[in-house]
Amino acid sequence: MCIRDRDEMVQNYPSRILYEEKADIYGVAVKLLTDLDWVDENWRRNFYAMSDRIRSHARLYVTFNKEYPENSVYYDPFTKTAFLFNFDYYGWIKSIALSLAGDVLEDEHGIYSIHGACVDVDGLGAVILGASGAGKTTHTYGLMRREKVRVIADDWFFVRGEENLLAFSSEKNFYIRADIASIWPEYKMLVEKAQFDNKGRAIVDLRWVVGKYRILPFTTLKKTIILIRDQNEPRIIIR
């Protein structure tokens, strides 16, 4: 969308805005503007809060409007402003917020986004990649049962550097599935205390189970693991 269309949409919003929250996503101030209680609540649980003294670098408007199709997204790359209409899944909303931060970081600072999980094992970082449903999150929480494993991110993180790549976390708390405890019983308490949405997911504080010292802000990447869910793949390491 162009700046003119963006300005017209912004002018139509003031009466709808009930919540304004700025998230600190690796130093980028992404501002949420919404009239939806559940979006505001998940947002505040999900991200670190940015100081009110910091002006926003990107903006995300989220609301319901019958004039637009389901899951509609309009984006102005010049002002880093996104409009989301008729979303009922928070996972997509947070992914777009992370994308906005990634757009700012890549354009202005040469810092790149990776959609994947990142863990630290004895001081060495490993990135876990794979298509949707490959098991990135499941394997991450499985690895976290080991005391020497610490987590940077289970879904999205940022990378910078040349010879030595540094991975940085993007979220304060994680968005888990309700079935995680049926796979790894160690997380039963976490699931019992969580408030799950209509998609069977919830923002939770993993520190309740693993402790605050096993959630790291960054690590040095040394290994890459690519998960492929294909029984016919000839390069299978573990079946």
Pin down the residues of each PLM region.
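Flexible phosphate/Mg2+-sensing switch loops adjacent to catalytic phosphate-binding sites
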Residues: 151-157
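Glycine-rich phosphate-binding P-loop
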Residues: 123-146, 151
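A noncatalytic interaction/capping subdomain that flanks phosphate/NTP-handling catalytic cores
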Residues: 4-127, 146-147, 158-239
